[in-house]
Amino acid sequence: MTYCYVCPHRCGVDRAETMNSPNGIFGSCGCGMQPIVARAALHMWEEPCISGTKGSGTVFFSGCNLHCAFCQNYEISCLNKGQEISVERLKEIYFDLIKQGAHNINLVTATHFTEAIIASLQEPLPVPVIYNTSGFETVDTIHRLKNKIQIWLPDLKYSDDLAAIKYSNAPNYFNTATTAIKTMYKQVGPYQIDENGLLKSGVIIRHLLLPNMLENTLRVIDWIADNFEPGQVLFSLMHQYIPCGRAAEYLSLIHISEPTRH
């Protein structure tokens, strides 16, 4: 890949140049082609069918194609803090986590490193691979990951496109994300859970309840109910919002979500 069109921003920049030159042109993600990893560890606080009893082998990639004002991982996703590594080292990280007992390998915000992800998964892993994403994906990128990802874990952040632009710089987010989610489902089909209650394959749609945006949430729920039958996808409604990142710049985002609304 010379010019990058891997995400819906379709920046068209030469990300190889950003790696090798301080004067390179940065796209929306602000990263070069080599993967940058901020943290890799067993994570016990994902959904129970993902974390299980031993943890999810979570790899947090630096940078992001969204820049959500309220991001809880702001230093990682927006300030790109982390260490640049090779594809070979990335594969080693997968197996280090598996040796520690990881039920799966959980790739967090990996879209801008799709080339490296594909290269690192040329040989199947002995555990499911999870693609943990903002939902702001292209159909082409999802197709390229076919047979490499067993579990899709997309956010469906917004049904309100004005809010998506305001808080995440994501034009046409709702149509883009819902099209992506339908494509993910076509790829892996209805979710499958093993005898230990762990997810083997399928789609979990996440949605974070944002302050003062209850209608946004209700429209997300309506879309899922209208487009999927019971037993096809899982839905994770989250209420752990706290003002992080640049949330203080927006009066509407400085409140903590009310558990009663959840």
Walk through the language-model features, giving the residues of each.
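Conserved AdoMet/S-adenosylmethionine-binding subsite of the radical SAM
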Residues: E92-L251
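N-terminal presequences and immediately downstream first alpha-helices
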Residues: M1-S28
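Short, acidic Gly/Pro/Ser/Thr-rich loop/turn segments
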Residues: G12-D14, I36, L66-A69, N212, ...
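Conserved small/polar residues in nucleotide/adenosyl-binding loops
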Residues: I254-H262
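Electropositive phosphate-/nucleotide-binding environments in soluble metabolic enzymes
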Residues: M1, Y5, R10, S62, ...
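Conserved Radical SAM active-site core
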Residues: M19, N23-W152, D160-L162
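Twin-arginine (Tat) signal peptide motif
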Residues: C64, K182, T260-R261
